[in-house]
Amino acid sequence: MPGDRLRRIVAELSDGEGSWAAARLCEVCPRIAGVEGAGVMLMSGDLPGGSLCTSNDVSQLIEELQYTLGEGPCIDAYQQDTVVSEPDLADPETVRWFAFTPPALRAGVRAVFGFPLRVGTVRLGALNLYRDRPGPLGAEQHADALVLADVTARWVLETQAGAADGVVAKALELKANFHFAVHNAAGIVSVQEDISVTEALIRLRAFAYGNDRLLEDVAQDVIARRLRLG
């Protein structure tokens, strides 16, 4: 029954006192969904805004790759507002993300799944799941992931509703990476090259992609004055 599934998942997410946080979500989610790892990506417009949490180093890399390259399961799930399933990244007949797939495979990722986070008409991002072996999610795992995405979206909205305008709720920041360094670096490049911040972000992404680096690492070099674009 749907209600039983919801109660079971909420109970697993709870800390025993009726509350839970993003860190516990990404800790418990892989066990519930039967996968190796999970991550929650929040979006800003049609672009990745940052990760709310990740369950392990590989999940963190998946989020970083999507943020750097602008493609991947979370981005498609959000933009298309539907579940995205790629059960075998190594299958040459079904290459969906030409930039994302090679480094993901090198990290040991064989299957990825994206579930949109939304409450009514409000879209927030996507829940990302990955496996180190090929194959689709089972029917029960898929149903559990849908509930996880729904519960996560509602929790994010409810938590942020209690924060002041323009301020991220502290409960959302605990395990998050909102890539503040990238925004700082974009500001620096904007001043150095006399361009808009938007154009600076585009150049940072292009440099990261062209040099096979993560955007966060490039940003840190710009901030430390080890790198100047232009």
Task: Identify the meaning behind each predicted range.
Residues 101, 114, 126:
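Short hydrophobic/aromatic beta-strand element in the GNAT-like acyltransferase core
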Residues 142-153:
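Allosteric cytosolic regulatory segments
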Residues 161-229:
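Signal-transducing coiled-coil/dimerization helices and immediately adjacent hinge/linker segments
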Residues 111-118:
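Short hydrophobic beta-strand micro-motif common in sensory/regulatory domains
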